[in-house]
Amino acid sequence: MPYRLLLNHLDVISEKGLNPEIYFSSDALDSYRPEDAIRIARVLADHNASVTIHGPFMDLSPGAVDSTVRKVTADRFSQALEAAAYFKPRAIVLHGGYNRWYFNGNKKLWLERSLLTWEPIRKRARELSIPIAIENIFEEEPSPLKYLMDALGDPFFGICFDSGHFHLFSQVPLKQWFDSLGRHFIELHLHDNFKNNDDHLPIGEGEINFDELFNLLRQHDIHPIYTIEPHRVEDVDRSFNAVCQYLGMKEFKTEAFPPGIAESLL
């Protein structure tokens, strides 16, 4: 949920008992006021909301060969951590940036440059007690992220597994991701698609095998943060209730959101 959306509709979000994943874009990081963040965090805490944060990602590359690009990326990630600290989140989701085509398959180069970015970010995240969850995006198989996890060897530094991105880009079975990275899963992003667009559909409305995914979670005894990612407000109920069926939870009803809140849901 974009920060500006939360800022404008805090009363609705808190009254409906939502646990938001707050997205701080680069623009939001440049424009937010600490006093607003403190107020929002207090209201969410008063409503016992559980919060996660999603950091900026557009144009950023923690494994960039260009040191100036890495510096901009590190600066943005640092800003996101400081903004996140107001909310005492369960985790902050950031992107690792590996793309086989961009790096010409050179995972070693990407990893070496990535570690230059992540070491100070990881240190600050530990000081703030905010676990970092790296989200899979364009990775075709889990080894780049596995190399990163092994190199850092920090339980505070894990994975946000995105079901939709897996389905779009992975060239290997879901089981291979769980066998390789499952023990590092901090969070799941749950949405569906038909493998031709990042549609962010409610689970069960595309072609992803969520029976297999939840069976693997049980087999590996993984208990992550579950985050639904509908991009349309009319999909919120169906997204939540589809996950409820797998988790044995009660159904969820948003009733009617006010005009304007449906513009964008992360």
Predicted regions and their residues:
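Acidic-and-aromatic substrate-binding clefts and catalytic sites of carbohydrate-active enzymes
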Residues: 1-8, 24-36, 61-63, 101-102, ...
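N-terminal pre-domain/capping segments
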Residues: 1-81, 85, 146, 249, ...
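Histidine-acidic metal/acid-base catalytic patches
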Residues: 7-14, 142-157, 167-266
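Active-site acidic/histidine proton-transfer and metal-coordination neighborhood
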Residues: 63-158
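A structural motif
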Residues: 17-18, 84, 89, 185, ...
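Alpha-helix-loop-beta-strand connector modules within alpha/beta enzyme cores
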Residues: 40-58, 113-127, 210-213
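Hydrophobic faces of well-ordered beta-strands that scaffold small-molecule active sites
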Residues: 1, 20-22, 51-54, 92-94, ...
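Charged helix-capping and loop-helix junction motifs
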Residues: 34-39, 69-77, 107-118, 171-180, ...
